[in-house]
Amino acid sequence: MAKEKFDRSKPHVNIGTIGHVDHGKTTLTAAITTVLAKKGYADAQAYDQIDGAPEERERGITISTAHVEYQTDSRHYAHVDCPGHADYVKNMITGAAQMDGAILVVSAADGPMPQTREHILLSRQVGVPYIVVFMNKCDMVDDEELLELVEMEIRDLLTEYEFPGDDIPVIKGSALKALQGEADWEAKIDELMEAVDSYIPTPERDTDKPFMMPVEDVFSITGRGTVATGRVERGQVKVGDEVEVIGIEEESKKVVVTGVEMFRKLLDYAEAGDNIGALLRGVAREDIQRGQVLAKPGSITPHTNFKAETYVLTKEEGGRHTPFFNNYRPQFYFRTTDVTGIVTLPEGTEMVMPGDNIELAVELIAPIAIEDGTKFSIREGGRTVGAGVVSNISK
């Protein structure tokens, strides 16, 4: 069958495989590409091609991740698979691979294991919104009752972490048998992809979200006003729009965008991904600074206190060589600026070691525009020592 041309018109969704080590995440990834390749929807990838993922660096952190792409009748997918547990933790916290949904792989022969639980918790904390379950290795379990028991266990575990355990699709299959071309098991991969297609919604595009632009630089043009430059993170901004200047200062200010410029050309509007200069009326050069954001009024608010799921770099990654304790005061780098914050460790935790993954409570010395899911780096004197994602805002 001739290869179908890559279709840009299909909606794009980012997904990934998660679950306990050796439950079959990589085998499933290989099976999906192999089964879809028969329809001309993917390039078949062997297990070894996926497993030998190259190391990447994201915010100074070394992560091994395999990226594959494929399509179904209705969508185009980018799929990430990580070889090691630590790679998942780092990946999900840095947002190196932003997932719109995940396929949780659980071995039917073993049932949920410690990392099954950890990956579900991480998904909840970093905001992976939807999970579909693939019960793998069902060819090794003859007892129908045992399969039902494992399914119930998985559903209970998902419910425990506030996912809709009763409604989540659970597909029972065998990635290895599908990879080997056995038709009955291949059909289960099709069933899985149908569940992913229908259960994981198409994400809202960045351009459709409310406008936000982190301010990188500010200067004034005599007779015209103040210009703030930066890359539009989401949404669109048009000439004449009212925007809010948020962060650092206690009070947010409303200003009007009187001009949008990109590559020295004037535009009517700018959208997510554009590097622009926004000409602002009614604001002095000294009233706006790097580290603030311009945003659609009311869409994001400044905060000082939050909880965050964090990963602390190892010495080998260029991080700290020693643990840190309660009241640790590093800088938190949000988008374009560092703000000092005071760290409170969870009750019963004496110290945090390099390489740990932990939920910290943070109090910043100045308010910053943040929301659940906002990513940041933890730095000491310009050197990255950790990465985190806001999981809960308290003030």
Curated annotation (Swiss-Prot):
Keywords: Cell wall, Cytoplasm, Elongation factor, GTP-binding, Hydrolase, Magnesium, Metal-binding, Nucleotide-binding, Phosphoprotein, Protein biosynthesis, Secreted. It holds the Pfam family GTP_EFTU_D3. InterPro entries: EF-Tu_GTP-bd (IPR041709), EF-Tu_GTPase (IPR050055), EFTu-like_2 (IPR004161), EFTU_2 (IPR033720), G_TR_CS (IPR031157), P-loop_NTPase (IPR027417), Small_GTP-bd (IPR005225), T_Tr_GTP-bd_dom (IPR000795). Residues 81-84 are annotated as: G3. The keyword Secreted applies. SUPFAM superfamilies: EF-Tu/eEF-1alpha/eIF2-gamma C-terminal domain, P-loop containing nucleoside triphosphate hydrolases, Translation proteins. Phosphorylated on serine and/or threonine residue(s), dephosphorylated by Stp. PROSITE patterns: G_TR_1, G_TR_2. GTP binds at residues 19-26, 81-85, 136-139. Residues 174-176 are annotated as: G5. One of its GO terms (biological process) is translational elongation. Residues 19-26 are annotated as: G1. Belongs to the TRAFAC class translation factor GTPase superfamily. Classic translation factor GTPase family. EF-Tu/EF-1A subfamily. PANTHER family: ELONGATION FACTOR TU, MITOCHONDRIAL, ELONGATION FACTOR TU-RELATED. GTP hydrolase that promotes the GTP-dependent binding of aminoacyl-tRNA to the A-site of ribosomes during protein biosynthesis. This is Elongation factor Tu.
